């Protein structure tokens, strides 16, 4: 039997014939789609064919025809309503089609009324505008250029002419929507391409911007989508960084509206007024098509540096500007208080409050008097708050809480606990701002009256983060929070803060590797320096935490401090970590490390045993490092004293010199104090190492380092160190004190010059003099005995 091809009529196809060019007739390259495969092979003949008919494709043809006819009828109604201006868009969730309608149906749709409406059959054929934009839902895709099928219908001899400036202004001022749409379609591509300033001169651009703002003045009959498009054009005109001409036009128009005597513009608005109030009036109309676009423009013309400088600066204190500042802040606060306000709009309001409050102290006062702190507290308490709202709120809180009384107001509301409840949030940028705010709050006295146990536990859980910013700020919170309330340190110890701090220090090389990656990537030097300072801050914070929880001041809870010392001594990494920072750390880290070691060894003497043979980074043991650090810091202390004397009081240089002097003073007296303890009470090998270092390796005489300008605390510990190393059994037998005094050529009368009002120092000097005199007598006796013994041996020699 002879095979036949598929029946053409069966599928309703039409023969193709060439037509002459007609600009009013759209064309298409889409062919009709058959409802089933055209192959004559049966399923048995081609069982493995991927094109085999599937059950879902084998529906009765009548249902398919019925569906396509209904679709064509809906499409015609949809297009007719659109063209007659009666179109009401359906709900986006219920919308069937994702494209704007075509002005004219496609060829196949007109011929067969069976083609389903798709993005290929819903084409723009407007030959006057190469870009058909979506006027209803911004989320819908729009044609970026004229489609190929529409290009076929354009007359190549007819070129599109640009609208003149008077035509644009007149069209925008018109009450006819079609005229406004034509002007907007002229401006929108230029605005999106950021080409308005390069296309128009300043005078022409000023006329256009003024006309756009005039469209925003409420009218009896207006289209919300036109208003939205106007807001978008104005926003795109102002958003680029380098559009000084546009910014000046905005500012000039604003000043003219604020001037009650100006009659230049015919805006039907009360005087005084401003472009800000024009935008605010539109933004306050919630649930409109343009409220979000209005808020976006308002945030831009409030927070951009140019407008903050010339509109919201503290220098602008005229009556009109003060009134404007109050209007903007009142609107922002009111918007935050309304439940109906969209969360994105609330985020814009918070950003406006944050930026303008930082720039202008009077605006800060206006906002504070409008009770902005309870509003911020409500935002962070709301578990459904969006990240885009929480993030600027955290930034604003950090700004406001830098003022002590404001921070205490926030803490009294329970704000610190509510902030810590957000520590489980997945946003990194949010955690950065949250912990920065908590660092400020943790220094306030009011936080001592709050129950912070759960909050402290949550902060401890994030200190081990690989994010250096989170680690720095979390450790900063723990460093501060124990000061206002000593009970907080008990909570920290109970939750294992010592182990967490040591673990961060033990694994700190991960931060160094991140820093090396930045250096290899040729990151700018200022960012490299910031990263180095951040890592140093992490070290200081962790060592400060260990220092704070082991502190035994008069207000501290001794049981907790002793427990912290025991926990540190039991940690297998503690000794190597503390020795490393004494060896290679910055001065502040050295001070904290030696202080922690001193306290732990004094309370748990067994903690000294690991240091007997433990080498540091430079292969030097603890007693040698303590001796080196004491002498190095003593020299630095002398230099810092001179810097303090040469610096002007109340200057940064003076404060830096004071801090440097204090750091090195602490290193000196704490190092020699710990060394004295080790020589007296520790393993005898500690003294052996000190003896070899001072007498043989690097001959050192402690008396030569004494000088009258020594502070009391250094002098006392230095004298005690001399007594400690000269009071051992070996030293007494070998008259080490007398050896040092004789070598330094120091008399007992000279030592009396070091007496101070402090009786403890006087006692130390007296003990040194007494010990020196006894050892001198002992030395003289030994010499006499040696001389007598020599004489006896000489006499016994045969003549």
Swiss-Prot record:
Lineage summary: Eukaryota, Metazoa, Ecdysozoa, Nematoda, Chromadorea
UniProt biased composition (Polar residues): 26-43
GO biological-process terms attached to the record: asymmetric protein localization involved in cell fate determination; canonical Wnt signaling pathway; cell-cell adhesion; embryo development ending in birth or egg hatching; embryonic body morphogenesis; endoderm development; endodermal cell fate specification; establishment of mitotic spindle orientation
Disordered: annotated segments: 1-60
Record's subcellular location: Cytoplasm, Cell cortex; Nucleus
Name the record gives this protein: Armadillo repeat-containing protein wrm-1
Cellular component GO terms, alphabetical: adherens junction; catenin complex; cell cortex; cytoplasm; nucleus; serine/threonine protein kinase complex
Gene3D superfamilies named in the record: Leucine-rich Repeat Variant
Ranges of the ARM repeats in the UniProt entry: 454-496
Ranges of biased composition (kind: Basic and acidic residues): 1-10
Listed SUPFAM superfamilies: ARM repeat
Gene from which this protein is expressed: wrm-1
Quaternary structure note: Interacts (independently of ARM repeat) with nhr-25. Component of the beta-catenin-lit-1 complex (also called the lit-1/wrm-1 complex or the wrm-1/lit-1 kinase complex) at least composed of lit-1 and wrm-1. Interacts (via N-terminus) with lit-1; the interaction is direct and activates lit-1 kinase activity which leads to the phosphorylation of pop-1. This promotes pop-1 interaction with par-5 and translocation of pop-1 from the nucleus to the cytoplasm.
Function: Antagonistic role in the Wnt signaling pathway that operates in embryogenesis. When located at the cortex it has been shown to inhibit Wnt signaling during asymmetric cell division but when relocated to the nucleus it shows positive regulation. Has a role in blastomere signaling during endoderm specification. Component of the beta-catenin-lit-1 complex which promotes phosphorylation, down-regulation and subcellular relocation of pop-1. Within the complex, activates lit-1-dependent kinase activity. Can substitute for bar-1 indicating functional redundancy.
Keywords: Activator, Cytoplasm, Developmental protein, Nucleus, Transcription, Transcription regulation, Wnt signaling pathway
The organism's place on the tree of life at top rank: Eukaryota
Species for this entry: Caenorhabditis briggsae
């Amino acid at each position: 039997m002879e095979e036949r091809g598929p029946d053409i009529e069966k599928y309703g196809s039409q023969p193709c014939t060439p037509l002459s060019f007609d600009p009013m007739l759209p064309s298409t390259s889409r062919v009709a789609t058959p409802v089933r495969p055209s192959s004559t092979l049966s399923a048995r003949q081609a069982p493995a064919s991927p094109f085999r008919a599937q059950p879902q494709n084998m529906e009765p043809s009548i249902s398919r025809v019925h569906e396509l006819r209904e679709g064509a009828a809906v499409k015609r109604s949809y297009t007719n309503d659109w063209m007659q201006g009666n179109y009401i868009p359906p709900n986006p969730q219920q919308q069937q089609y994702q494209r704007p309608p075509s002005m004219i149906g496609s060829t196949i749709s007109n011929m067969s009324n069976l083609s389903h409406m798709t993005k290929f059959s819903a084409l723009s054929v407007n030959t006057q505008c190469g870009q058909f934009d979506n006027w209803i839902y911004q989320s819908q895709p729009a044609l970026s250029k004229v489609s190929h099928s529409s290009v076929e219908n354009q007359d190549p001899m007819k070129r599109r002419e640009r609208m003149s400036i008077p035509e644009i202004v007149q069209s925008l001022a018109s009450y006819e929507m079609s005229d406004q749409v034509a002007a907007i379609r002229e401006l929108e591509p230029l605005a999106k391409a950021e080409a308005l300033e390069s296309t128009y001169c300043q005078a022409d651009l000023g006329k256009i911007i003024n006309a756009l703002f005039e469209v925003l003045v409420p009218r009896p009959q207006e289209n919300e989508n036109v208003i939205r498009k106007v807001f978008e054009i104005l926003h795109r005109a102002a958003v680029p960084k380098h559009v000084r001409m546009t910014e000046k036009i905005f500012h000039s128009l604003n000043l003219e509206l604020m001037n009650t005597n100006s009659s230049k513009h015919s805006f039907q608005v009360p005087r005084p007024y401003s472009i800000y109030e024009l935008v605010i009036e539109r933004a306050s109309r919630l649930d409109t098509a343009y409220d979000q676009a209005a808020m976006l423009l308002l945030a831009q013309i409030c927070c951009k540096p140019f407008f903050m400088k010339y509109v919201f600066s503290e220098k602008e204190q005229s009556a009109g500007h003060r009134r404007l500042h109050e209007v903007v802040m009142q609107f922002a606060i009111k918007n935050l208080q309304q439940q109906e306000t969209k969360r994105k709009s609330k985020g814009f309001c918070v950003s406006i409050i944050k930026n303008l409050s930082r720039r202008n102290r009077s605006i800060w006062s206006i906002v504070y008097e409008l009770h902005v702190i309870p509003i911020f507290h409500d935002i962070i308490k709301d578990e459904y708050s969006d990240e885009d709202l929480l993030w600027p709120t955290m930034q604003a809180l950090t700004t406001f809480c830098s003022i002590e009384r404001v921070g205490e107001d926030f803490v009294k509301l329970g704000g610190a606990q509510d902030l810590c409840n957000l520590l489980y949030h997945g946003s990194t940028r949010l955690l950065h701002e949250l912990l920065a705010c908590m660092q400020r709050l943790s220094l306030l006295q009011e936080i001592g009256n709050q129950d912070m146990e759960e909050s402290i536990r949550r902060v401890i859980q994030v200190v081990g983060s690989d994010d250096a910013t989170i680690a720095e700020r979390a450790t900063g919170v723990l460093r501060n929070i124990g000061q206002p309330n000593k009970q907080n340190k008990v909570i920290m110890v109970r939750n294992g803060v010592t182990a967490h701090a040591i673990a961060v220090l033990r694994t700190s090389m991960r931060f160094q590797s991140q820093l090396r990656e930045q250096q290899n990537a040729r990151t700018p030097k200022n960012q490299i320096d910031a990263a180095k300072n951040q890592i140093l801050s992490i070290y200081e914070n962790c060592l400060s935490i260990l220092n704070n929880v082991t502190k035994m001041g008069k207000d501290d809870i001794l049981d907790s401090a002793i427990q912290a010392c025991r926990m540190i001594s039991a940690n297998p990494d503690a000794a190597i970590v503390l020795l490393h920072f004494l060896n290679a750390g910055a001065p502040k880290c050295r001070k904290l490390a030696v202080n922690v070691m001193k306290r732990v060894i004094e309370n748990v003497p067994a903690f000294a045993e690991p240091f007997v043979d433990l080498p540091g980074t430079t292969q030097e043991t603890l007693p040698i490092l303590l001796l080196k650090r004491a002498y190095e810091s003593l020299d630095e202390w002398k230099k810092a004293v001179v810097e303090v004397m040469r610096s002007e009081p109340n200057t940064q240089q003076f404060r830096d010199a004071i801090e440097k002097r204090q750091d090195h003073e602490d290193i000196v007296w704490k190092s020699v104090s710990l060394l004295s303890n080790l020589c007296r009470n520790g393993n005898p090998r500690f003294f052996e190492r000190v003896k070899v270092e001072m007498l043989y390796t690097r001959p050192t005489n402690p008396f030569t380092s004494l000088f009258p300008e020594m502070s009391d605390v250094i002098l006392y510990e230095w004298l005690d160190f001399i007594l400690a190393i000269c009071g051992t059994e070996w030293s007494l037998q070998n008259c080490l004190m007398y050896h040092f005094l004789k070598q330094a050529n120091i008399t007992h009368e000279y030592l009396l010059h070091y007496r101070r009002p402090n009786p403890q120092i006087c006692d130390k000097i007296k003990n040194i003099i007494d010990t020196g005199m006894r050892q001198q007598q002992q030395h003289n006796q030994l010499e006499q005995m040696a001389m007598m013994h020599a004489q006896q041996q000489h006499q016994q020699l045969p003549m």
